[in-house]
Amino acid sequence: MSRISSLQDPFLNALRKEKVSVSVYLVNGIKLQGQVEAFDQFCIVLRNTVNQMVYKHAISTIVPAKSVRMVYSSFNPYHQNSNDEQDENVDDIHSDDLEIQENEGNIHE
């Protein structure tokens, strides 16, 4: 299952590395804003005026303020690639509504 949901970690890591401002919508409708400081399998640390730890199960959508360049492995079955021999795919993720799913992983700082 971790290979299938491998889109989440590269997306969050790109947001963290590029220090992109994000809007995080929770399942209860609350909107949080800030930058992804760190993340692991269960939570995201969102930095604004203070650091907030947000549990992933409470997140509905993460919307970046600008396009994000993302690299992910080609074994993702949900991504169509014209060249199946290619090891990595690079896509621009735009500030459309992006739903994230729970994933296994280590903390990234």
Swiss-Prot record:
Region (Disordered): 77-109
InterPro entries named in the record: Hfq, LSM_dom_sf, Sm
GO cellular component: cytosol
Domain Sm: start-end pairs: 9-68
The entry's keywords: RNA-binding, Stress response
CDD domains: Hfq
GO molecular function term, any single one: RNA binding
Protein family: Belongs to the Hfq family.
Function noted in UniProt: RNA chaperone that binds small regulatory RNA (sRNAs) and mRNAs to facilitate mRNA translational regulation in response to envelope stress, environmental stress and changes in metabolite concentrations. Also binds with high specificity to tRNAs.
Quaternary structure and interacting proteins, as annotated: Homohexamer.
Protein name, UniProt field: RNA-binding protein Hfq
Source species: Francisella tularensis subsp. holarctica (strain LVS)
Name of the gene encoding the protein in the UniProt record: hfq
